[in-house]
Curated annotation (Swiss-Prot):
Organism, as annotated: Sinorhizobium fredii (strain NBRC 101917 / NGR234)
InterPro entries in alphabetical order: Cro/C1-type_HTH, Lambda_DNA-bd_dom_sf
Residue stretches making up the HTH cro/C1-type domain: 24-78
Entry annotated with the keyword Ubl conjugation: no
Name of the protein in its database record: Uncharacterized HTH-type transcriptional regulator y4wC
């Protein structure tokens, strides 16, 4: 039986699927968990986890529940910022904050996550400011 165009559209991953996949990847990396380990915890291969994270395959509600349990978060975690993201996409380009791709790439890198984890543990605002100044200084010497 041939499927209609609307059926194909419903099954095709969309921006929300990509966002959920991105949040799965972020949380998994935050937990220092491999794709293989997450896959084993939810009963799929690491390739399937990869497809979820890239937004290639949709994550069903039951599977999302399993993922949230394995990653120790509520299912709503994967939808956080979805509304804000959609709203920001609707704004004109002049109103959007443009984050350079290399910054985004660093933030989701292993080193970026380690740095963010360590920095988030520093409670004293003055110490945080000094760390920022130090990193800026070190970066200036690299140029």
């Amino acid at each position: 039986m041939l499927s209609t165009n609307s059926e194909q559209t419903r099954r095709k991953p969309n921006a929300v699927d990509a966002h959920v996949g991105q949040r799965i990847r972020q949380r998994r990396e935050w937990q220092n968990m491999s794709q293989t380990t997450l896959g084993e915890a939810i009963g799929v291969t690491f390739q399937q986890v990869q497809k979820y994270e890239k937004g290639v395959n949709r994550v069903g509600a039951g599977r999302l529940q399993q993922i949230s349990k394995a990653l120790k978060v509520e299912p709503s975690y994967f939808f956080e910022d979805t509304l804000n993201k959609i709203r920001s996409e609707e704004r004109s380009a002049s109103n959007q904050i443009n984050i350079p791709p290399e910054v985004v790439e660093f933030v989701v890198s292993k080193e970026g996550i380690e740095l963010i984890r360590a920095f988030s543990r520093v409670g004293d605002y003055r110490v945080r400011r000094r760390i920022v100044m130090l990193v800026k200084s070190l970066g200036a010497h690299e140029r």
